């Protein structure tokens, strides 16, 4: 296999892919969910996520689907190894709508199947259909076997289930990734290395150990299509050709880098902005850097590299500059990124070896020889230099070994080009910006507005012994990780790891006296520790251990206090939206499920591990194994609450921003961007005049209908929303007429919440199964009215749904709990179990599939009607599976099999063995009008009476009868409760024979058992010695009052009342007289 010969073992590659995917998605959620911003191609974590998803589809491909050829620019360099080019476009076409396939195949700059695969992935993320596509793919095992090996990730049921559950976290993100760029026509090194087709050492040449390799993440790549950059590389003292002329493409290959996402220019139109129209063959390879400049010190294996780096960065940012004789003038700490125009200028790099600055160490054989990097053009006042500290003994050098090429670090997004300059104070980050137009600052929000802290200064000052340790370069050397574009990620890039301070900084500058022995890294200062209060979880995450809970935030065993004060252990799972309690880890029976959207309070952790979670209408008293474990649970719950709830602010202040003139001078490069550009938020009424007038006629079934503004495509669009007891409809007004734009069933509405973070109390959002609707009302009162009405409609629906679950009180509590667990996903289908659905038409669904929300209709996919629910589905969700409809059997005695959707078929399979239908309550007249049901009801009553006899017998016959029941013990409890399996057997004509066999077995036991015969009756009319039984319906009759059994013939001859009842009345009269 290619994955074994050329790269990692398939199982090891899966773990690498999962780690990349988990880290990038969590970083994107942390950055974008709270701010409701859109993820673009400029985000470094989006690059990593796309590379990991590409690796998912590449991992385990059969060799026949992998072309072993180099593409494009790589052919020009014979010394470069050919990159494999896996292709799975035919597989993707099989699960994709033909219109989307046509659009991708007609893209101007995408002319290869590889490009279509990569463009398809980004388009799926933009449309929010990645989870849906993966479900469809996993439901096609034959196609997967054709394309993938048995060890592939997509053919591993457990790993595929984890991937599917983890991708649900993408629903909280909005993507606008570029998918039309020509650079997508070839695979880059990152997804190929992650999937195991290429060695990871080629992706990261300075990394030697596999354990350290998993901890590293490649530096975010810059994608640029201009071909005017010429880069010269000079090496002294190495076996590399001097003055080698490199283009952006060759430099990318020389450093074994990869372009992880399509293009930072967001669309192919940007390719034409500066260089005019270009064909895909002439577009340049994106310039990106993935090689690390060193390795971090790993003396403490329990301490996360991320935590150490964060501590030193915060300590250095918070420290105040100290004056010294060697202190250089302060350089600006913030730099606006270069625009595309500035990137068009020529940039050159020179590398000159300086081996004297880097002594050899015996602890590692990895060569990281020093190079002196400087820009050929004259430095301008706009240049910014940041010194980076040299890594410690973990990245030793060797004088006899030639240094491997060191890739320059390039900022992500629209950030400037950066080159490393190794001076006498260590490597410096030099940014040349001849023209500095406005742009987003690459400094993150955590890097400014912090008061100076003296303890942190002292802690950071103790790390280096150099006399010039307080220069701006040395202060910047400890400032890491570098913020990259709009990214605010906790994951470490290659440049971040190179800038980790080592145990001593004696090599930073030559000193007259020999440097002292390296001292262990000091503990974090109190100021730094105080900054770590922003950590969401204080135990496993701060120790640097990965999340072991497979997509969940936390799971474990917790005791819960019951109504009688008795503690009982449950297995608990905390997901981003729910807190669930199971009976045990092995028995996956959910006994409680609480939505975090309705969490009202989180109690403190006590010394014995007790803590409380308060939800609307209930309070959970829980107890963990220790106080630390309880605090860990509470921290995870608070973290989840921060993600699902809007940030509340106590006070609102309206700030009026003056309009800026068009010819206003640009801000200096060293100035901070305004606060409004740091936190992008939807432009509300302050930026545009909203028209609230509407003269449309309300819908006939509307409870509430008014004009609201919906936030879509970064602007507020007016819509007319109509709320009824069944749905929430969205209309667009065109030519003074209402046109249905979308429709959300009440069963799909999860909650409605105020969202003051959008601009004020008049903003709110409705959370549905398909999307999150961000709305703006005319005023606060109107928004409050909408929220109250939607909550009342939801409460009404939930009450009716609960009544449908209990089916009129015919289910006991245990059966209800089992039913709720079995129908957690498809609970809204319960209402159609005993009621014939009404076909409402395709317009009521807004021309969307009721299963996957795809557009259906005559101009799209042909809609298919589900006979069970009366809803319309697409051809993927409805594959013409046939089944009997229980409601039609109950009410119409219609035994015909009708086509149902896959969702309904799965629902019927889940509840197949549950006795949910009480025929006596739903339609008792069916016994009278249908002869077969009359006989079945009679047999069910006989079996019930026989079950009472066998239940009192000590011979063990009841166990034997239960084996013959096939887990239908409810047949012995109630004669009127039926399951879907019973109705299906009735329709097939095998149910009567099944009951007769059970009656024959039970009656034979009663007749021949000494204990059971003694519980028989003697006819009190004829007083015959024959023993009679109540289940002998053909020869006996039973008194309805005292339940005494008589011969049917004797009762007909006497024609009097029950003699036993007559005696009882006589005794009662005598007692009254006496």
Swiss-Prot record:
Query: Which parts of the sequence belong to the RUN domain?
Result: 40-182
The phenotype of cells or organisms lacking this gene is:
Osteoclast-specific conditional knockout mice show normal tooth eruption, developed normally and are fertile, but trabecular bone mass in long bones and vertebrae is increased. Osteoclast differentiation and number are normal, but bone resorption is decreased. Show mislocalization of osteoclast lysosomes at the perinuclear area, instead at the cell periphery, and decreased ruffled border formation.
Q: What is its main location?
A: membrane
Annotated region (Interaction with RAB7A) at: 672-1074
Q: PROSITE patterns per the record?
A: PH_DOMAIN, RUN, ZF_DAG_PE_2
Q: Where is the PH domain?
A: 551-642, 701-795
- Biased composition annotated in UniProt, kind: Polar residues: 313-329, 393-404
Q: Where is this motif: LIR?
A: 649-655
Q: List the Phorbol-ester/DAG-type ZnF regions, as residue ranges.
A: 1004-1058
- Pfam families in the cross-refs: RH_dom, RUN
Start and end residues of each stretch annotated as Disordered: 214-244, 272-336, 382-454, 506-526, 661-680
GO CC terms, sorted: autolysosome; autolysosome membrane; late endosome membrane; lysosome; nucleolus; nucleoplasm
Concerning Gene3D superfamilies, the annotation shows: 1.20.58.900, Pleckstrin-homology domain (PH domain)/Phosphotyrosine-binding domain (PTB)
UniProt function note: Acts as a multivalent adapter protein that regulates Rab7-dependent and HOPS complex-dependent fusion events in the endolysosomal system and couples autophagic and the endocytic trafficking pathways. Acts as a dual effector of RAB7A and ARL8B that simultaneously binds these GTPases, bringing about clustering and fusion of late endosomes and lysosomes. Required for late stages of endolysosomal maturation, facilitating both endocytosis-mediated degradation of growth factor receptors and autophagosome clearance.
Another remark in the UniProt entry says: Sialyl-lex is a carcinoma associated antigen.
What is the protein's name according to its record?
Pleckstrin homology domain-containing family M member 1
Q: State the organism of origin.
A: Mus musculus
Which gene holds the coding sequence for this protein? Plekhm1
